[in-house]
Amino acid sequence: MTKMNVESFNLDHTKVVAPFIRLAGTMEGLNGDVIYKYDIRFKQPNKEHMDMPGLHSLEHLMAENIRNHSDKVVDLSPMGCQTGFYVSFINHDNYDDVLNIVEATLNDVLNATEVPACNEVQCGWAASHSLEGAKTIAQAFLDKRNEWHDVFGTGK
């Protein structure tokens, strides 16, 4: 397979076992700051996906709430394949802490009573949301918290 510019295109998606959180890449800036990009994989690639209303609400809830748990978050974005999200941190390389931040954020999702910015002024597709769908996705991921570190399903 020819090496491609996009890191995830070089990942053999048939070898990973969701759910997991993995360091997908790092980038150092000119002043020494380092961006750490994590792959938060909720669903098994090419086997499952998150339905759009639940995924969309989960994106809003996570993007808003994750920043309550870390001031190092640069961005949280959904994957187009609808199997997960990317989250990027600046100058924060503690993998176990990232797992704890994601866990706390997903617990916020479970406790949410509304989806933030779920209106036509603040959202580009305000009609496509499901708070209950987001909670279902979050709960399923939290239920497998002990598997998040095991990207390839080796049990290690």
From Swiss-Prot:
It is an enzyme of class 4 (lyase). Binds 1 Fe cation per subunit. InterPro entries: LuxS_sf (IPR037005), Metalloenz_LuxS/M16 (IPR011249), S-ribosylhomocysteinase (IPR003815). Its EC number is 4.4.1.21. SUPFAM superfamilies: LuxS/MPP-like metallohydrolase. Its cofactor is Fe cation. Disulfide bonds: none annotated. Keywords: Autoinducer synthesis, Iron, Lyase, Metal-binding, Quorum sensing. GO terms for molecular function: iron ion binding; S-ribosylhomocysteine lyase activity. It holds the Pfam family LuxS. One of its GO terms (biological process) is quorum sensing. It comes from the Bacteria. It catalyses: S-(5-deoxy-D-ribos-5-yl)-L-homocysteine = (S)-4,5-dihydroxypentane-2,3-dione + L-homocysteine. Fe cation binds at residues 56, 60, 123. Homodimer. Involved in the synthesis of autoinducer 2 (AI-2) which is secreted by bacteria and is used to communicate both the cell density and the metabolic potential of the environment. The regulation of gene expression in response to changes in cell density is called quorum sensing. Catalyzes the transformation of S-ribosylhomocysteine (RHC) to homocysteine (HC) and 4,5-dihydroxy-2,3-pentadione (DPD). Belongs to the LuxS family. This is S-ribosylhomocysteine lyase. It comes from Staphylococcus aureus (strain bovine RF122 / ET3-1). The lineage of its organism: Bacteria, Bacillati, Bacillota, Bacilli, Bacillales. The gene is luxS.
